[in-house]
């Protein structure tokens, strides 16, 4: 037999949409719990506690051009949505984004910049990042400075009013140099 508190809780759960329950309890979760359950919302269709892996390619629509939240798995699906929520929960952020690769994430970030903007990056970064910066994004009038980020002075000397991004990859690839992220963040905010 359920206690009054348990009955009250069950009644409240039925009244409050799952997204709000998630918001209420996520702040009390510890890191390991957030990593696993932070993005979970009870499945309204089947009641699954953990999000299943959705492997469908397309979703049924109510009518042409009026989807119910998802259209194609290549753009988004419930599995990825909950993963992004879990990442946001771990980071205590409102939103999280997942990409198919690191270069896809870099591409999305760099595309928020405008012609004439300058980016300071480590001179020892992943070759794919370097080629993306030099061969693709310099064509869009972005200016990249590649410096030794282990020396904060070399970064500080280059920062100017056009600097919009300090790109840090640490540990670096291939040399495995470690950039002091805290000091780099302080330097960026100072300027």
Model-identified regions with their sequence ranges:
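Buried hydrophobic positions in well-ordered alpha/beta secondary-structure cores of metabolic enzymes
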Residues: 47, 87, 105, 119, ...
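Short, small-residue-enriched loops and turns at beta-alpha junctions
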Residues: 127, 152, 172-176
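Active-site core of PLP-dependent enzymes with the aminotransferase class I/II
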Residues: 172-191
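Conserved N-terminal alpha-helix of the aminotransferase class I/II PLP-enzyme fold
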Residues: 58-107, 111-112, 128-137
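Short, Lys/Arg-enriched N-terminal segments with co-localized hydrophobic residues
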Residues: 13-28
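Conserved PLP-anchoring active-site segment centered on the Schiff-base-forming lysine
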Residues: 111-129, 147-148
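Short conserved active-site loop signatures built around small residues
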Residues: 29-53
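Short acidic/histidine-rich motifs immediately flanking catalytic phosphotransfer sites
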Residues: 159-166
């Amino acid at each position: 037999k359920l206690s009054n508190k348990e009955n009250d809780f069950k009644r409240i759960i039925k009244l409050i949409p799952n997204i709000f329950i998630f918001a209420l309890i996520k702040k009390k979760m510890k890191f390991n719990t957030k990593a696993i359950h932070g993005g979970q919302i009870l499945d309204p269709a089947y009641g699954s506690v953990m999000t299943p892996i959705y492997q469908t390619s397309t979703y049924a629509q109510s009518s042409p051009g009026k989807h119910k939240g998802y259209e194609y798995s290549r753009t988004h699906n419930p599995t990825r949505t909950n993963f992004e929520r879990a990442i946001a929960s771990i980071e205590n952020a409102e939103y999280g984004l997942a990409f198919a690769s690191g270069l896809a994430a870099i591409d999305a970030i760099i595309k928020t910049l405008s012609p004439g903007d300058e980016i300071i990056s480590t001179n020892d970064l992943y070759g794919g990042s370097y080629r993306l910066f030099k061969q693709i994004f310099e064509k869009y009038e972005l200016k990249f400075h590649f410096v030794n980020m282990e020396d904060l002075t070399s970064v500080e000397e280059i920062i100017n009013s056009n600097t919009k991004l300090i790109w840090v990859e640490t540990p670096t690839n291939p040399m495995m140099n470690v950039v002091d992220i805290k000091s780099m963040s302080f330097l960026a905010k100072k300027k």
